[in-house]
Amino acid sequence: MKIIKASEMGIGPAENRTKPMVAFVIACIIVLGNVQMTSAQTARLLPTASGTGACTDIMAYGGSPANRDNGTALAVALKASSGDGRCVYFPPGRFTFASNFKFMLPNGSASITLTGAGADVTQLYWPAGGGLTIDYVGAQNSVHLRNLSLTTGSVGVGTAVLLNQTNGDVGVADNALNELSGVTIRGADGYSQNDYWDRAVEIKQICNVNLVGLVISGPGGAAYSDKGIGVVLEGSTSNPAVVFNVTGATFDYLSKGIVYGQQVQGLTVSQSNFVGDDYGIYVPANISGLDQLTVVGSQFNCATAGIYVGSSLSNTLFSANLFIVPNTGRGIHLQQAYLYSAVGNSFNIGTAQGKTYPIAIEVGSTAGGGTITGNLFDSMVTAILLDRTSSGANVQSNEYSNDLTTVNNLGTGNTVGGGTP
């Protein structure tokens, strides 16, 4: 058997191996020397949002979980970023703010990002309410809140996030995209405990907003809550609020999950949950300028109504949703109905039947017709109630199981069964 020498295997004599070894040791020493930097030095070297896209660490500007008020540190960190893009990172920990933090975007094209290490990993905490207020000055402004929690130590005080357009004549064309992603809003004492915000998110005269993975928790202690509001959308005649996408969100134990205000259009809710609320999605009476509501693939268990429409809201679509309807209310209540479709939803009882409730779908005064088809109704007192002021409803091909009344048609010009052309 031939024995291969080391030199034949590509490994030279010992004297030839010393130089690579020395070079390797020297390289390691250099690398280790460069690593020995303080966290503050590292943070200050992070590029800002106007540079390569990374964020400034608030710890580099005096922010700390040990501070009683991090408002000054956040203001300094935001101002330290140059250009139109400003980004501040909050590491793990609870950062206290003594009062409302208000920031006005400096020009018509400015944008900011506040990001954390993850919801509940990073907390922005207001012992006495307060929250964040961001004032816009133009249509190209945008705000991005990501991966953090906003908590309060108070009961029913303050708004956690207020996005406010101060320019009175922006219109709806070509607005920049805004987002809340991976954000949790709750009391500092935990989920569905005692503390809660009066309003979690308020969006005034802002367009193009994505709410993704948003979690809002109100006060617990009962099967259904009548305190706290999740998201409030508000527009105006000169600045209608248009295009809102709510995806993978959770609204628990609130008086109302999502509330329409004046001049709101284009809300889409998908893959979201409304549990323990009084109302899930709420459109109050006597408001105008409303259009387009789409709710798909979501689940509701609400005391009074999963979805309530009290003003004329045209072009509404409800499809592939699950409604758990207790004996205190309705699944869908269209008090003002206008060009609506309820297709492929499931309505199941949440408690024992009462004398009047649960009602799965109730349709009131109708400005335009609608379709109710392909739905499943189980153990409702009344599956479908068409009020005396209803008209133009087309009710076809639904499945009924153990319902005391399938369709109660009190209106005029409604079609129940019999197929369509």
Predicted regions and their residues:
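N-terminal secretory signal peptides that target proteins for export/translocation
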Residues: 1-17
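Bacterial N-terminal signal peptides
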Residues: 22-34
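Acidic Gly/Asp/Thr-rich repetitive segments characteristic of extracellular carbohydrate-active
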Residues: 58-91
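Extracellular beta-strand-rich solenoid/capping regions of secreted or surface-exposed proteins
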Residues: 75, 79-81, 96-115, 123-176, ...
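Short glycine/acidic-rich loop motifs that flank beta-strands on beta-rich extracellular proteins
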Residues: 86, 98-100, 119, 123-131, ...
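Leucine-rich solenoid repeat scaffolds
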Residues: 373-421
